[in-house]
Regions:
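Glycine/proline-enriched, intrinsically flexible loops and inter-domain linkers
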Residues: 1-232
Length: 232
């Protein structure tokens, strides 16, 4: 429930005036309806490991989309909606990172490209640092141009990051927006869905897989949705 509350509070705090203090009083009129045992108020022994990184993103998207019906000129299109969690390692080493993507376009501006958005708090890992400490080589790290949705205001682009494994490893992916694209608003187009590719072959959004030395994993993160009809 704490993740659910944080995600809802985050959205509402973004809509409040800047001078509003960060305190319980600012949100005292908010009532959360999340019955015990439901998806957003899970009880032990339910698995909740990805709640803070993926479920929180879904909650933010749902609340923003609902508010867009009543605040159409204040709500942005959907951002990438995932943290693109990548974990890898073996008995001798382990590494975990999250990958940025596109932000949704706002009613008056383009979305930002290749950045984390909403419920996130992680920094970019330089390729040089990763390669210096682990048997992994970064063969591509670039903006995924054209992945943001078209519109009067364009969604931000995602990014591409490719890992070449120099030793056998186990890889776990916890990602979203591989089936349903980040939505556009007010006639704007959806952003591109994310993709996970191992040696060019698609992988599902969530998987644990064994890889061998020489194999390559390419992550293409989602673009943000566009806002408004293009050309108007």
């Amino acid at each position: 429930l704490s993740v659910t509350a944080a995600a809802v509070y985050y959205v509402l705090r973004c809509l409040l005036p800047d001078e509003t203090p960060n305190c319980a009083g600012a949100l005292e009129l908010l009532e959360l309806a999340a019955p015990e045992g439901c998806l957003v108020n899970a009880l032990s022994p339910a698995a909740t490991a990805a709640g803070n990184v993926e479920t929180s993103q879904r909650i933010v998207d749902v609340v923003l989309r609902a508010l867009a019906e009543v605040l159409p000129q204040r709500i942005p299109a959907a951002s990438q909606g995932t943290m693109n969690n990548v974990g890898m390692g073996s008995a001798d080493w382990s590494y975990y990172e999250t990958l940025a993507g596109g932000c949704g376009a706002a009613p008056d501006s383009d979305g930002r490209s290749a950045v984390h958005s909403h419920m996130t708090n992680t920094l970019n890992t330089p390729a040089e640092v990763l390669e210096a400490h682990f048997p992994v080589r970064i063969t591509r790290y670039a903006r995924r141009r054209g992945s943001g949705g078209n519109g009067r205001w364009r969604g931000g682009d995602g990014l591409e990051r490719e890992f070449e494994f120099l030793a056998p490893a186990e890889v776990t992916l916890i990602t979203e927006r591989r089936v349903h694209a980040p939505w556009g608003l007010d006639g704007g187009n959806d952003g591109s869905r994310g993709e996970n590719l191992l040696d060019g072959q698609p992988l599902p959004a969530k998987i644990t897989v064994e890889v061998q030395a020489g194999q390559r994993l390419l992550i293409r993160t989602p673009g943000g949705g566009g806002f408004g009809t293009s050309g108007l």
